A protein has these predicted regions:
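Active-site-adjacent structural segments surrounding the nucleophilic cysteine of cysteine proteases
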Residues: 1-93, 148
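Conserved active-site-adjacent core of cysteine acyl-enzyme catalytic domains
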Residues: 63-64, 68-208
Length: 208
């Protein structure tokens, strides 16, 4: 398996042990006792954004690999929105993560180079990993239940950091407790959820 190095995991929610219960609706995210670590203004703001910031959780992992200091999740979101990487319309709908504004922002804010991969295959993702990149892949959030049939592709970002001929290794920011970190799935399974869109972040080029 081609793995660049150990990659720290970051969850979309402050308490990763609550994800199963939050996603299933048994627990309200506003009851997360650890939410203060994300520095949102109030529980409602935390609840609204936690389920929409998979890309920022992936970014935090990348910044940790590079040893780059990062602000709080709420401050990251403010910066991302200021650069157009997320957009909140007047009706409350969120667009994002929007790839090209995101790459412009992380280049300006953290000196982090990257590129968009469109219409890409898992072989292309593997080539990026071999060249020393980490890859944020667009998959269906249904990937947290890989043994069940899915009805969509895309809509959620996971951080791919390893692969071999048959399998893909990744972090899922909204995975259940047993499949959040260093998840290994057969390529054929991952491909069912994969939208063919990704962001490649060349770690070797960005090491300081």
């Amino acid at each position: 398996m081609h793995v660049f190095r150990p990659v720290p995991y970051h969850c979309q929610w402050a308490d990763r042990d609550l994800v199963d219960s939050i996603v299933s609706g048994r627990v309200d995210a506003r009851a997360d006792a650890k939410q203060g670590t994300f520095c949102f203004g109030d529980p409602d703001e935390y609840e609204f954004w936690a389920r929409r910031t998979c890309g920022l959780a992936c970014l935090e992992s990348v910044l940790d690999v590079l040893g780059i200091a990062k602000p709080s999740r709420a401050d990251l979101l403010k910066q991302a929105m200021a650069h157009g990487a997320y957009r909140l319309d007047t009706g409350g709908a969120v667009q994002g993560l929007i790839y090209r504004p995101f790459l412009t922002w992380v280049k300006n804010a953290f000196g982090l180079s990257g590129r968009v991969l469109e219409y890409c295959t898992l072989d292309a993702v593997a080539q990026e990993l071999d060249s020393g990149s980490l890859v944020m892949c667009s998959v269906s959030p249904e990937i947290r239940r890989p043994d069940e049939s899915n009805v969509r592709r895309g809509g959620h970002l996971v951080l791919v950091h390893g692969c071999d001929v048959d399998t893909i290794r990744f972090h899922n920011p909204s995975g259940f407790r047993h499949n959040q970190e260093n998840v290994v799935l057969p390529r054929t399974t991952f491909e069912r959820f994969f939208a063919g869109r990704a962001l490649s972040l060349p770690i070797l080029e960005n090491v300081r």
